[in-house]
Amino acid sequence: LDELGEIALTEKMALNGVPINPFERQPISEILDVGIRNINALLSLGRGQRVGIVAGSGVGKSVLLSMITKSTDADVVVVSLIGERGRELASFSKQVLSSHSRNKVVVVAVPADRSPLLRIHGAKRATTIAEFFRDQGKDVLLITDSLTRVAHAKREIGLALGEQPTSKGYPPSVISMIPS
């Protein structure tokens, strides 16, 4: 997207990392400045917290995520754009990658026209990149747009493999993947 060429790899990491034991996690005690005063004042986010922005289509979730990406005080922002349309990717890259924050943003983009396996792989790769920077001691903000499209991709794979659908038509593999 940024036309800056290849990225040199310094080390390799497993795509499926080991989850942190919840009992070993530090309690959330510090606020993350997302750069949007209304969110900071009314719905402040803690460093290490997981948050979902849930709303209907066309209400500005992606715009809000791009504003947070540009304005947050996190050291590194990893943005996972999964299942987006081409024009949405172009719009995001124009808004975020052309700003002063581009040096701290890593974008993993897998458009909607790619296979479900690649979309799942893209989401996992973004998480692995975020874990890499976290392990270096950096404050990392991981944004996935859209987790719904990740779940749809996993559902396509699960149903193709013969998994029986459960809640809302999703197979158990989706329900076990999302929390991790």
Where are the regions that the model predicts?
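P-loop NTPase nucleotide-binding/switch module
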Residues: 1-49, 54-56, 62-67, 99-114, ...
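Short, function-defining helix-loop hinge/capping sites that tune catalysis or transport
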Residues: 43, 91, 153-154
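Conserved P-loop NTPase nucleotide-binding/switch module
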Residues: 59-63, 67-76, 81-82, 86-87, ...
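Short, surface-exposed alpha-helical segments at coil->helix boundaries
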Residues: 86-94
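Juxtamembrane helix-loop transition segments at the membrane interface in multi-pass membrane proteins
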Residues: 93-106, 156-158
